[in-house]
């Protein structure tokens, strides 16, 4: 039977991608249905109890700038906050928070259940309704059919998921959850390229069986960082430390002597694992010269006894896992409460997607999260928001939107996936972005909130706060530009005391702030330039904008040059065999990838600058050289 009411957008899956997709579509006023196999696991942290990190924290800030959920949820659930790379430049600084799993899940569920235009329904999805190459609905395991104008697939590791512990394996979406086998079979019937990937998780340890007294502590930062541009530290619950232990030669001997029982090394697992989050087996074999690896013991919550040992993800048999755990300092008597495991799952080639994350072959069908070959909560959340907003726009007969590489890490992520694809689980790093000085955590709202408002993602409260911040920045910069001190002035001695070289000429507040030894905090304690802004976010922006003004201007020039290529469009139906002068390799790659623009084409491996020049000349001769607005 059909459900009596139609929907504009259906989201299948309630993980980090699905919850952001559902919230985005509903915020934009579209009637949205979130289908999940279990309402109690909405927003579940399936692996590590943490949000953020290098590159990942940038994505969380961007999701937040567009009105998303993740940053607000972690501000309510974070039990340790730190700024990584704090001693480095602002482009690579990143926020990371340890999470209380239960609080995080509760924060997500509360937000979903209180979001207008959003309905949640508990049933696993087994089929899609596709008519004339357009998706028009979904079918649940009990045969209930839902109609919609757009469907977003955010199914994580559930598609034909297979869990491995040693040489034993069984079907599962993650530990304790069934896989989605009928939906996997249905998707394999569609004209989509499919592959297998693998990820893993470590065993969880009973905190009562660890001797923390012999371990080094790692505390959070004080003052505590905040993730959301709308948040403040008063939202954070009690803060707790993490602990550090290490593997040793005994640990490594245990692993090496049991590799024949590893499903990965025995050839049982076909899927490719994440390069930047390898299993402990991989680390020991790939870095054979290392006699130890650092392991972080991370609490899973304020009311939980479970400890997440970050760094020993494994699919070795349980008896070997026990030996590994007990070989480390402080863990000699440790007890495992959940075994580690690896999981294999289906993913679909993201090169078959438009930058909006809509399928090129099935109209109205969007993909987000691990189904696209990514790994990580943050990457999933960012894709979910993008897919959700574009599903909402499609259902309202509006054009899709995707950020450029120069606008957001989300733009880098989507362009990498849709242009290059991936053969291993993709994770975000700041090194993937060409314009990372422009794409900082601190200015995510300045880059994206106005766009979010135009798209209908940003509410009145966030918009008012954003405009107030803009006004504070502009007003303070004008004040510092127009406040001067001369070498002969009475205040000069006070100023000179904070400078490595005394004033030799008249200087404005901005002139002084450009000096490497001067900070905004220090400057605004000096008589001519007091008082400081009480808006800490605006104050941070003032300092960064002034200190890095020259570098930012140069990078902006580079972006404008690159935009000419990004905006030069390539016809979707173009057969590159008709263009003389291109090599067979280039023709094959262009016909395979079908890039949307000259910029995309230039990033495909093997497509040379000479080939790009030939393309541009051919387009001009054919009268097909056109640029997007």
UniProtKB/Swiss-Prot annotation:
<dbReference type="GO" id="GO:0030488">
    <property type="term" value="P:tRNA methylation"/>
</dbReference>
<dbReference type="InterPro" id="IPR002218">
    <property type="entry name" value="MnmG-rel"/>
</dbReference>
<protein>
    <recommendedName>
        <fullName>tRNA uridine 5-carboxymethylaminomethyl modification enzyme MnmG</fullName>
    </recommendedName>
</protein>
<dbReference type="InterPro" id="IPR020595">
    <property type="entry name" value="MnmG-rel_CS"/>
</dbReference>
<dbReference type="Pfam" id="PF21680">
    <property type="entry name" value="GIDA_C_1st"/>
</dbReference>
<dbReference type="InterPro" id="IPR004416">
    <property type="entry name" value="MnmG"/>
</dbReference>
<dbReference type="GO" id="GO:0005829">
    <property type="term" value="C:cytosol"/>
</dbReference>
<dbReference type="InterPro" id="IPR047001">
    <property type="entry name" value="MnmG_C_subdom"/>
</dbReference>
<comment type="subunit">
    <text>Homodimer. Heterotetramer of two MnmE and two MnmG subunits.</text>
</comment>
<keyword id="KW-0520">NAD</keyword>
<keyword id="KW-0819">tRNA processing</keyword>
<feature type="binding site">
    <location>
        <position position="180"/>
    </location>
    <ligand>
        <name>FAD</name>
    </ligand>
</feature>
<dbReference type="GO" id="GO:0050660">
    <property type="term" value="F:flavin adenine dinucleotide binding"/>
</dbReference>
<dbReference type="InterPro" id="IPR040131">
    <property type="entry name" value="MnmG_N"/>
</dbReference>
<dbReference type="Pfam" id="PF01134">
    <property type="entry name" value="GIDA"/>
</dbReference>
<keyword id="KW-0274">FAD</keyword>
<dbReference type="GO" id="GO:0002098">
    <property type="term" value="P:tRNA wobble uridine modification"/>
</dbReference>
<dbReference type="InterPro" id="IPR044920">
    <property type="entry name" value="MnmG_C_subdom_sf"/>
</dbReference>
<feature type="binding site">
    <location>
        <begin position="13"/>
        <end position="18"/>
    </location>
    <ligand>
        <name>FAD</name>
    </ligand>
</feature>
<feature type="binding site">
    <location>
        <begin position="273"/>
        <end position="287"/>
    </location>
    <ligand>
        <name>NAD(+)</name>
    </ligand>
</feature>
<comment type="function">
    <text>NAD-binding protein involved in the addition of a carboxymethylaminomethyl (cmnm) group at the wobble position (U34) of certain tRNAs, forming tRNA-cmnm(5)s(2)U34.</text>
</comment>
<feature type="binding site">
    <location>
        <position position="370"/>
    </location>
    <ligand>
        <name>FAD</name>
    </ligand>
</feature>
<dbReference type="Pfam" id="PF13932">
    <property type="entry name" value="SAM_GIDA_C"/>
</dbReference>
<dbReference type="InterPro" id="IPR049312">
    <property type="entry name" value="GIDA_C_N"/>
</dbReference>
<comment type="similarity">
    <text>Belongs to the MnmG family.</text>
</comment>
<keyword id="KW-0963">Cytoplasm</keyword>
<keyword id="KW-0285">Flavoprotein</keyword>
<feature type="binding site">
    <location>
        <position position="125"/>
    </location>
    <ligand>
        <name>FAD</name>
    </ligand>
</feature>
<dbReference type="InterPro" id="IPR036188">
    <property type="entry name" value="FAD/NAD-bd_sf"/>
</dbReference>
<dbReference type="InterPro" id="IPR026904">
    <property type="entry name" value="MnmG_C"/>
</dbReference>
């Amino acid at each position: 039977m059909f459900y009596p009411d139609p929907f504009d957008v259906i989201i299948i899956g309630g993980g980090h991608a699905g919850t952001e997709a559902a919230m985005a579509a509903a915020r934009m006023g579209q009637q949205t249905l979130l289908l999940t196999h279990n309402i109690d696991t909405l927003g579940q942290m399936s692996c590590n109890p943490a949000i953020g990190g290098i590159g990942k924290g940038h994505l969380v800030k961007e999701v937040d700038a567009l009105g998303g959920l993740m940053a607000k949820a972690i501000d309510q659930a974070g039990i340790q906050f730190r700024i990584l790379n704090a001693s480095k430049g602002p482009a690579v600084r990143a926020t990371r928070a340890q999470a209380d799993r239960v609080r995080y899940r509760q924060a997500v569920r509360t937000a979903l259940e209180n979001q207008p235009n959003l309905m949640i329904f508990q049933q696993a999805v087994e089929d899609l309704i596709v008519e004339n190459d357009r998706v028009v609905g979904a079918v649940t395991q009990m045969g209930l059919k839902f109609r919609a104008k757009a469907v977003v697939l955010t199914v994580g590791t559930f598609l034909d998921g297979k869990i491995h512990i040693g040489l034993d394996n069984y079907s599962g979406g993650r530990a304790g959850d069934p896989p989605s086998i009928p939906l996997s079979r249905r998707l394999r019937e569609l004209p989509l390229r499919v592959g297998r990937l693998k990820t893993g998780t470590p065993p969880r340890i009973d905190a009562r069986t660890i001797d923390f007294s012999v371990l080094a502590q790692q505390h959070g930062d004080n003052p505590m960082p905040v993730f959301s541009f709308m948040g403040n530290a008063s939202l954070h619950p009690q803060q707790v430390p993490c602990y550090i232990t290490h593997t040793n030669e005994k640990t490594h001997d245990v692993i090496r002597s049991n590799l024949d029982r590893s499903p990965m090394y025995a050839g049982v697992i076909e899927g490719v694992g994440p390069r930047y989050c390898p299993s402990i087996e991989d680390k020991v074999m790939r870095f054979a010269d290392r006699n130890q690896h650092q392991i972080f013991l991370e609490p899973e919550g304020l009311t939980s006894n479970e400890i997440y040992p970050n760094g020993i993800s494994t699919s070795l048999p349980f008896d070997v896992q026990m030996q590994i755990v007990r070989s480390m300092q402080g863990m000699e008597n440790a007890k495992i409460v959940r075994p580690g495991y690896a999981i294999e799952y289906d993913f679909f080639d993201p090169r078959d997607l438009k930058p909006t994350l809509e399928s090129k072959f099935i109209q109205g069908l969007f993909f987000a999260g691990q189904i696209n070959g990514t790994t990580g909560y943050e990457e999933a959340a960012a894709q979910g928001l993008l897919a959700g907003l574009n599903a909402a726009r499609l259902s309202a007969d509006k054009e899709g939107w995707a950020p450029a590489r120069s606008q957001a890490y989300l733009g880098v992520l989507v362009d990498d996936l849709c242009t290059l694809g991936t053969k291993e689980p993709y994770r975000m790093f700041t090194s993937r972005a060409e314009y990372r000085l422009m794409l900082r955590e601190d200015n995510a709202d300045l880059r994206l909130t106005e766009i979010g408002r135009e798209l209908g993602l940003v509410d009145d409260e966030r918009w008012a706060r954003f405009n107030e911040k803009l006004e504070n920045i502009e007003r303070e910069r004008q004040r510092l530009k127009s406040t001067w001190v001369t070498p002969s002035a009475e205040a000069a001695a006070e100023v000179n005391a904070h400078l490595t070289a005394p004033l030799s000429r008249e200087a404005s507040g901005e002139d002084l702030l450009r000096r490497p030894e001067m900070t905004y905090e220090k400057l605004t304690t000096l008589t001519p330039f007091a008082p400081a802004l009480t808006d800490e976010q605006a104050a941070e922006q003032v300092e960064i904008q002034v200190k890095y003004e020259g570098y930012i201007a140069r990078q902006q020039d580079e972006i404008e040059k690159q935009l000419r290529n990004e905006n030069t469009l390539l016809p979707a139906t173009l057969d590159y065999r008709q263009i003389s002068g291109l090599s067979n390799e280039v023709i094959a790659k262009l016909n395979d990838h079908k890039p949307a623009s000259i910029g995309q084409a230039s990033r495909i491996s093997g497509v040379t600058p000479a080939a790009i020049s030939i393309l541009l000349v051919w387009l001009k001769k054919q009268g097909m050289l056109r640029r997007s607005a």
